[in-house]
């Protein structure tokens, strides 16, 4: 190839990567949009915040998570579930398109679902279609699948225990006094939930963009963390999605 042909190839590759990054950020936006109701349901239903105030509140904490959470989830998605060398632009496109499509379908029909599960399933399905099940990292997949099942059970157990404990502790208090304090405490719980949502789910998109950059040579396998712009843009995208949700 002459110099002009090489430059054209690099430029084409760059635009393919850029479009896939935009698609990943669209998924991240949809994640925030799709899951916004989970973050604000309690504070809106009890009248602690108006809907517009609640989404701004949740979006703020989605983004603030950037300063608190370590990038361990991004590392798992980016390097821990697929064998090196398997991922290419086609795999990333298939994974993102599948996850976005499922998110839109479940949102439209009002079906409770997880954007995280959709993304992990999309990645796994695209990789299996390309190279078979041997291309998956068994330890990473098993850990992810285990937590998919453990999380709701753990949430149910802890929620039940907390409800029993709170009812017992405040059994002799006047309802008006309890209501006053718990309306304030709901802000803390909603903020903590939004913080966790941003810190966990934004990192999954960071991970898939990092996976894409590694596959296309725009990042090195020796890098300990993804580029800063991916981190900032993903946290902004999920925050904006929540704001519009």
Write out the residue ranges for each language-model feature.
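Multi-pass alpha-helical transmembrane bundle typical of ion/small-solute transporters
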Residues: 3-245
């Amino acid at each position: 190839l002459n110099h002009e042909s090489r430059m054209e190839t690099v430029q084409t590759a760059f635009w393919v990567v850029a479009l896939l990054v935009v698609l990943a950020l669209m998924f991240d936006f949809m994640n925030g949009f799709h899951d916004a109701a989970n973050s604000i349901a309690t504070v809106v239903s009890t009248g602690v915040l108006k809907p517009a105030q609640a989404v701004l509140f949740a979006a703020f904490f989605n983004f603030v998570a950037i300063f608190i959470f370590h990038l361990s989830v991004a590392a798992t998605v980016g390097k821990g579930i697929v064998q090196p060398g398997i991922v290419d632009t086609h795999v990333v496109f298939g994974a993102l398109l599948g996850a976005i499509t499922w998110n839109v379908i479940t949102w439209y029909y009002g079906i409770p679902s997880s954007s995280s599960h959709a993304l992990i399933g999309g990645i796994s399905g695209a990789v299996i279609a390309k190279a078979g099940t041997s291309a998956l990292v068994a330890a990473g997949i098993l850990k992810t699948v285990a937590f998919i099942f453990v999380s709701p059970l753990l949430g149910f157990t802890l929620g039940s225990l907390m409800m029993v404990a709170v009812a017992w502790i405040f059994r002799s208090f006047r309802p008006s006094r309890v209501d006053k304090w718990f309306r304030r405490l709901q802000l803390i719980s909603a903020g903590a939930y939004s913080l966790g949502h941003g810190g966990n789910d934004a990192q999954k998109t960071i991970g898939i963009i990092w996976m894409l950059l590694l596959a296309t040579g725009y990042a090195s396998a020796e890098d300990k963390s993804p580029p800063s712009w991916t981190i900032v843009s993903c946290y902004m995208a999920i925050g904006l999605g929540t704001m519009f949700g």
